[in-house]
């Protein structure tokens, strides 16, 4: 009975394993993988539709939304207007979103608009639109990002303990 209970506890902790292993060597649970894929796919689909419509009207500039606690790859570009074209002439008012100046790693999983990035690209027409995004202090942003990361770790621990409690109660070991 003890071996069975240990096995059930172990399975409950690990969840349903996927074969996905990230660059850090962490194996993702199926639940985490599905949640991440659905969130990213929905955001990317909406973003692509918006940008397709923008290109129909020859609009290439976007206002990048800003929020406290943004990842490092997003911290410099957020709250600024950027040009979506890969290369723009040096006399253009707005830098390309791909410009190394931003350090945004745009188009990569861990970069700006990558996995779990919540930034939006709002169509921006120079001379018509205004930048209404709040400017965020880089040091404060980094501090909040670290605190948010720690909060997520604590939330995962709470979920783990609740799973243990549910399994124990189901096995009548409260």
Name the predicted role of every residue range.
Residues 115:
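Long, His/Glu/Asp-enriched segments that create or flank divalent metal/ion-associated functional microenvironments
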Residues 119:
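Catalytic core of tubulin tyrosine ligase-like
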């Amino acid at each position: 009975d003890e071996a069975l209970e240990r096995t059930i506890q172990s399975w409950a902790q690990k969840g349903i394993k996927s074969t996905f292993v990230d660059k850090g060597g962490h194996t993702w649970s199926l639940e985490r993988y599905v949640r991440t894929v659905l969130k990213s796919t929905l955001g990317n689909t909406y973003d692509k539709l918006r940008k397709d419509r923008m290109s129909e009207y020859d609009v290439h500039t976007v206002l990048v939304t800003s929020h406290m606690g943004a990842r490092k790859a997003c911290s410099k570009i957020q709250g600024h207007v950027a040009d979506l074209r890969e290369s723009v002439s040096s006399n253009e008012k707005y830098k390309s979103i791909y410009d190394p100046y931003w350090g945004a790693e745009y188009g990569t999983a861990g970069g700006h608009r990558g996995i779990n990035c919540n930034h939006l690209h709002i169509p921006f027409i120079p001379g018509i639109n205004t930048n209404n995004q709040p400017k965020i202090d880089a040091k404060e942003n980094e501090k909040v990002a670290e605190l948010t990361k720690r909060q997520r770790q604590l939330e995962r621990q709470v979920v783990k303990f609740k799973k243990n409690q549910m399994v124990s109660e189901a096995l009548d070991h409260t």
